[in-house]
Amino acid sequence: MNSIEFPLLDQTTQNSVISTTLNDFSNWSRLSSLWPLLYGTSCCFIEFASLIGSRFDFDRYGLVPRSSPRQADLILTAGTVTMKMAPSLVRLYEQMPEPKYVIAMGACTITGGMFSTDSYSTVRGVDKLIPVDVYLPGCPPKPEAIIDAITKLRKKISREIYEDPISFQRENRCFTINHKFHVGYSTYTGNYGQEFFYQPPSTSEIASDTFF
């Protein structure tokens, strides 16, 4: 069920000896034991909760929900993310050990949804805060779509090449409280002071193409 193809795992001998690499073996062990951290804020989370029942039985994928980010390697954001919630979401992501993955579930998480038109406190896309691996559109998405997103993530993990965490290049992530985003570096110390919510400089000091 949901078999994943490995280029180097199909070379077997008559003595049942498997020829593979450490990288493929590590990917194989990780894709069948994803431990998600559920970050649900609205109706999308209810759809995910239905997977726990016997009808869908998401335990067959090796998913074990965790309540601590230090024990999780997958965070699933479901629902609206506001500016006040943004620092806690970034902190949870930074506390997760490498390698870690993100599934953005629902229109409100991906683009802000219906709240993005007239709300001043809604984040227009969680990818402004943390990198997203799989986008799952819908309002809300069905449980079958969630299973499909998890399957796509497992296929992505099976083809990964291990990267040294020290040399891993992180992208610039930032946010402000008034939706005038300015490119800057994330804070990885775990200490979130007033300097994290910096005052955006005037438009005369920044080129127009730096806003998004």
From Swiss-Prot:
Main location: plastid
Position of the signal peptide: none
Residues annotated for [4Fe-4S] cluster binding in this entry: C43, C44, C108, C139
EC number: 7.1.1.-
Coiled-coil regions, chain positions: none
Cofactor note text: Binds 1 [4Fe-4S] cluster.
Locations listed in the record: Plastid, Chloroplast thylakoid membrane
A cellular component annotation (GO) from this entry: chloroplast thylakoid membrane
4Fe-4S among keywords: yes
MF GO annotations: 4 iron, 4 sulfur cluster binding; iron ion binding; NADH dehydrogenase (ubiquinone) activity; quinone binding
Pfam family, one: Oxidored_q6
Highest taxon in the source lineage: Eukaryota
InterPro entries: NADH_UbQ_OxRdtase-like_20kDa, NADH_UQ_OxRdtase_20Kd_su
Alphabetical GO biological process terms: aerobic respiration; electron transport coupled proton transport; photosynthesis, light reaction
Disulfide bonds: none
Role, per record: NDH shuttles electrons from NAD(P)H:plastoquinone, via FMN and iron-sulfur (Fe-S) centers, to quinones in the photosynthetic chain and possibly in a chloroplast respiratory chain. The immediate electron acceptor for the enzyme in this species is believed to be plastoquinone. Couples the redox reaction to proton translocation, and thus conserves the redox energy in a proton gradient.
NCBIfam families on file: nuoB_fam (TIGR01957), PRK06411.1 (NF005012)
Record-stated family: Belongs to the complex I 20 kDa subunit family.
Assembly, per entry: NDH is composed of at least 16 different subunits, 5 of which are encoded in the nucleus.
Protein's name in the database: NAD(P)H-quinone oxidoreductase subunit K, chloroplastic
Species per Swiss-Prot/TrEMBL record: Phaseolus vulgaris (Kidney bean)
